[in-house]
Amino acid sequence: MGKGDKTHINIVVIGHVDSGKSTTTGHLIYKCGGIDKRTIEKFEKEAQEMGKGSFKYAWVLDKLKAERERGITIDIALWKFETAKFYVTIIDAPGHRDFIKNMITGTSQADCAVLVVACGTGEFEAGISKNGQTREHALLAQTLGVKQMIVACNKMDSTEPPFSEKRFDEIVTEVKSFLKKVGYNPATIPFVPISGFNGDNMLEPSSNMSWYKGWSVERKEGNASGKTLIEALDCIIPPQRPTDRPLRLPLQDVYKIGGIGTVPVGRVETGVIKPGMVVTFAPQNVTTEVKSVEMHHESLPEASPGDNVGFNVKNVSVKDIRRGSVCSDSKNDPAKESKNFTAQVIVMNHPGQISAGYTPVLDCHTAHIACKFAELKEKVDRRTGKSTEASPKFLKSGDAGIVELIPTKPPCVESFTDYAPLGRFAVRDMRQTVAVGVIKSVTKDDGSGGKVTKSAAKKK
């Protein structure tokens, strides 16, 4: 395979706060990644000076995180690494304050979640307890449609005795049982005993665990087996990018560029956009023609899902459209404004309870929407989705329910089954994510009488 031929995949690393996510991720980036020798040497020197000689790999990530949180745009290559088959981008790792929000409004959808659990005595139990984040992260991944999972059983070097087969088996049994409850099929999940710190079973089979015969998975796309974490990553089933769906492109920004005009910028979520196409922006219901499409300052004949593009539109002012607007093909299921919508929400960390009338802010794709919980229709079992109570008075942390939401100003959202990236949202209140949801159905405005530019009218 030539260098340019590898498929790009996105992973998200999840697990309890002390499970060793940073060390494990850092190890992969360090050994297979985009960090050049000079940077590593610089980090190592700093670590030694600070007396963090044992920094190993987490330090790499701490540096990157600190820079990312200070808003320094760091070279995104630092979050990438390569396997035999894939270019892997780590789209986020928790511990980051906005992790949950990021995972939902996701700059992109993760193709696979790597769940890191710590196997040290007492550590695993803490992570999986009622208050541990292990379950919450796994549930979140499942709710947001991350279909594939790999479990890295970390810190095998600190079990009693070290590298204990008995402890590994015990943990695998436990994790399988709760992943099943969340909705994953354990037969499709590789379980790999590793030490992210020492490197056991990360890239090469470990001589410390000769008892480990390897992982194997059964799935309709074909069975697979291997011994190491990197091999498990290599067996991820690459996603089908949704080029055949109608266009949906949520805007991140709209620029006015002298001599060119209005340039909306955003990421193609579904479908394709190309010059000459007549597009409609919702909820504003503005229709115009695309003059050109650019990515990284080069003009493109067309852009497809995953591409971050800027495109030039004719006779539309910067005042007409804004961040959160959605661009669509006016001739193929154009996007419309959403009057109200029904969603399934899971309440995560709300200190009190949510009842009808509650009006928080929803983050859905690039839009920021004030919304009223108009009606709590039913409480449902999180795992099965079956109704457990009709018209509940309130929902509290841990509950899931079907609710009717009415936005204060109509946005453009879609049902999760039609356009997944536009159908997931985070409910934000008190500066944190209090619930997550997926949209089941949307009442749309038929949107007659919008603005149509001359060039668009000509093409109709």
Curated annotation (Swiss-Prot):
Keywords: Cytoplasm, Elongation factor, GTP-binding, Nucleotide-binding, Phosphoprotein, Protein biosynthesis. InterPro entries: EFTu-like_2, G_TR_CS, GTP-eEF1A_C, P-loop_NTPase, T_Tr_GTP-bd_dom, TRAFAC_GTPase_members, Transl_B-barrel_sf, Transl_elong_EF1A/Init_IF2_C. Residues 15-22 are annotated as: G1. Residues 92-95 are annotated as: G3. This protein promotes the GTP-dependent binding of aminoacyl-tRNA to the A-site of ribosomes during protein biosynthesis. The keyword Metal-binding does not apply. Residues 71-75 are annotated as: G2. Residues 154-157 are annotated as: G4. It is found in: Cytoplasm. Its main location: cytoplasm. GO terms for molecular function: GTP binding; GTPase activity; translation elongation factor activity. This is Elongation factor 1-alpha 3. PROSITE patterns: G_TR_1, G_TR_2. The keyword Protein biosynthesis applies. Residues 195-197 are annotated as: G5. PANTHER family: TRANSLATION FACTOR. Pfam families: GTP-eEF1A_C, GTP_EFTU, GTP_EFTU_D2. Belongs to the TRAFAC class translation factor GTPase superfamily. Classic translation factor GTPase family. EF-Tu/EF-1A subfamily. One of its GO terms (cellular component) is cytoplasm. The modification 5-glutamyl glycerylphosphorylethanolamine is found at residues 302, 375. HAMAP family: EF_Tu_A (MF_00118_A). It comes from the Eukaryota. The gene is eft-3. Residues 6-243 form the tr-type G domain.
